[in-house]
Amino acid sequence: MANQVIKCKAAVAWEAGKPLSIEEVEVAPPKAHEVRIKIIATAVCHTDAYTLSGADPEGNYPVILGHEGAGIVESVGEGVTKLKAGDTVIPLYIPQCGECKFCLNPKTNLCQKIRVTQGKGLMPDGTSRFTCKGKTILHYMGTSTFSEYTVVADISVAKIDPLAPLDKVCLLGCGISTGYGAALNAAKVEPGSTCAVFGLGGVGLAVIMGCKMAGAARIIGVDINKDKFARAKEFGASECINPQDFSKPIQEVLIEMTDGGVDYSFECIGNVKVMRAALEACHKGWGISVVVGVAASGEEIATRPFQLVTGRTWKGTAFGGWKSVESVPKLVSEYMSKKIKVDEFVTHSLPFDQINEAFDLMHAGKSIRTVVKL
């Protein structure tokens, strides 16, 4: 099958705001420096829902969504040297070419090698590998894991431990790595510190895990859904608060609770008003607030400059700052040695033909992560 078109099932988004449709698609063989992967498991993330809603400025249709997956290499294109058929892999929405100025700079993980084409839903050569009913279907985030087979650039693949359970480690393709790295790499949380985590979904729980790993003495979870508090405490939150329980702004509540503010705060929702609250909940002189959530297109953040003049830092992170190709295998190893939690994030498991239910569970706030098995 290596040089042939594969016919398989995929969940196609024909247009914004409509449920995904399970279709038979054709997946072309990998071209030079591309890899075709048989996807074994994929999770559904808020970013997929964000694009499907129509709010994503890079949302193009028809498209195969999905970016939190894991699978086995089926075949490789010409010039691929670091991967071979049979390798166990996680596709990466942030690549690591190792050559661009971003990859060569230790301060960032934002490889730009294929950014332009990836943003258009195309492979690096400007074309797609997917067709359905005679129509070209676009790629998504360079990964498109909602398909039994997908084609990705060879710089967008992490080769991982073949013994790793793919229905678990697929989560390391986005949410867990993003939150965990926000605490360790972006904030650089210090032992004995106080942290506040806004938004207790999968990413927020991963931030809590990272804060705890870094030795934070106090971790305050913040969410308007109190049903999320028990799980947040299982992950390491010392206490949880609901902004709706207070008559004053949540930043004032946190400042009073922590003798002047928290050392580190994290916004894991994508709400610009919450981003402001997270910054203003930080301690004068040294507080750091990390924006992790993705806001809707066109949204702007605001605060008084005095907040920054008086020593607070506002920063953001993508994929937790991890340089992807080299870091994801290490994160899988940390999971395999029980250093980090992954299983605990999986609240539901569904067969592929019920993938739309995964979105329903997420919108209802009933799931942390739903894993879909292909």
Swiss-Prot record:
It is found in: Cytoplasm. InterPro entries: ADH-like_C, ADH-like_N, ADH_3, ADH_Zn_CS, GroES-like_sf, NAD(P)-bd_dom_sf, PKS_ER. Its cofactor is Zn(2+). The modification N6-succinyllysine is found at residues 233, 315. The modification Phosphoserine is found at residues 247, 324. Zn(2+) 1 binds at residues 45, 67, 174. The keyword DNA repair does not apply. It comes from the Eukaryota. It catalyses: a primary alcohol + NAD(+) = an aldehyde + NADH + H(+); a secondary alcohol + NAD(+) = a ketone + NADH + H(+); S-(hydroxymethyl)glutathione + NADP(+) = S-formylglutathione + NADPH + H(+); S-(hydroxymethyl)glutathione + NAD(+) = S-formylglutathione + NADH + H(+). Binds 2 Zn(2+) ions per subunit. It is an enzyme of class 1 (oxidoreductase). GO terms for molecular function: alcohol dehydrogenase (NAD+) activity; fatty acid binding; formaldehyde dehydrogenase (NAD+) activity; identical protein binding; S-(hydroxymethyl)glutathione dehydrogenase (NAD+) activity; S-(hydroxymethyl)glutathione dehydrogenase (NADP+) activity; S-(hydroxymethyl)glutathione dehydrogenase [NAD(P)+] activity; S-nitrosoglutathione reductase (NADH) activity. Homodimer. This is Alcohol dehydrogenase class-3. The lineage of its organism: Eukaryota, Metazoa, Chordata, Craniata, Vertebrata.
